[in-house]
Amino acid sequence: MHLTCTKPFDWQKLLKFFAGRATPGVESVAANAYRRSLRVDGRHCIVEVRPDPAGDGLLVSCTAGEGDSVTAVQEFARTVFDLDAPIAEIQSVLASDATLRALLKTHSGVRVPGAWDGFELTIRAILGQQI
């Protein structure tokens, strides 16, 4: 499936973020792709996310099959990779500050990485503070 997003989109920064926090046996980052196991609607599936070569979004594959499970994976991926961020608005606000404006030149399209569920996000936050 193809998920669109507004440009710019800094896939490499997101991938680096997830690579540094990948849970062994659950997630991996390799060959410009993010992969993970996931439970959707009570079924186990493998999700792979990679950039669309056309540059206008992400390609997501999933072993969940069809229907509601695929829709759930699409929604999760949109959240995890922050695909619906209002980039123009964000950049406009950041550009109003001289220091942040300078950073936009080298960090344009940065997104806020999410998590596949609230429990996972909580555990990552707690462990991140401990390390």
Question: What is each stretch, according to the model?
Answer:
Residues M1-I131:
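HhH-family (HhH-GPD) DNA N-glycosylase catalytic core used in base-excision repair
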